[in-house]
Amino acid sequence: MLKKGLALTPVKFGISFTSSFLNQAGALLHVYTDGSIHLNHGGTEMGQGLNTKVAQVVAEVFQVDIARIQISPANTGKVPNTSPTAASSGADLNGKAAKEAAQTIKQRLVEFAARHWQVGEEDVQFRNGQVRIRDRYLSFEELIQAAYVGQVSLSSTGFYRTPKIYYDRAQARGRPFYYYAFGMACAEVLVDTLTGEYRLLRADILHDVGASLNPAIDIGQVEGGFVQGMGWLTSEELVWDDQGRLLTTGPASYKIPTVADVPADLRVKLVENRRNPEDTVFHSKAVGEPPFMLGIAVWCAIKDAVASLADYRLQPAIDAPATPERVFWGVEQMKKLHQDVGRVQPAGQGQGATPNGGLHPPYESGSHA
């Protein structure tokens, strides 16, 4: 017998290192006379798109194509004392540091152009790879070459530290996070009550990333985070032997999600027209870890499907990860409960009534649907 389950779960995720001293980042930026730009920052690119986002920040400041920008891997000989790329803060911290370095050089260029061509600083505008100086138009590299001849420094460091964060653990007071990221996921599952096997049929996700630096990257991060969270709560089970040795040491025994576990119908939308009210890099929000928690929707949907066997009176105690074996035993719990309720239900008691006599764990009250 097949049963469907549906669950809607939200997430509110604080963004910042809780060790406040880690909320800092540096950058080193060089602009060359051919108009190319070389950037070093303290973040580590792991495939999450960090370098692309930080390069976009610099490109936006100078109003040039991102192809001009080359980023070197993190190197403490260039940017020392780097914080970990963690806590979903990579783009926030390093993007801000890179932006400061770029703005420093840009301001030097504006001051030079105003002085050299005898115009006001407000008459110097960077647009679409060109620089307008009142009625004169120069390419970006032409301005750079002129500034070099004019002995203007074309290198700068940038530094950023997250403001407003403080926390007194003894008093349990303060502001541990700079801001929060929000999201919501709705999952629909199909459970085989004979075997405990299940399949995620569809997932709908709405996530808040502020003013997205790169929607394609952010949507990809939401998709990946959700699938990773789904694995955490459904299949990734750690098993130790009697001596405390870990037995699930590889993919043969520790099951991570595969492409076959991703629902054929996976819909991700980013919240539109909602800038981060805090002064983050172009008012964007972090997207690394928050979507991971949205995988909870799958676990709750599985419990909802199993709860239907007892008319949703109670929720089965299916621990995470909800492996097929645990789901099977959850099904057996609900079947037994349903039979017990049928035997003890007084005559005339409505179908919607909830018997409360003699019920003990592994049954839980409540519904996730």
Where are each of the predicted segments found?
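Cofactor-binding beta-sheet edge motifs in enzyme active sites
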Residues: 1-341, 356, 363-369
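Intrinsic, low-complexity polybasic segments
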Residues: 341-345, 349, 357-358
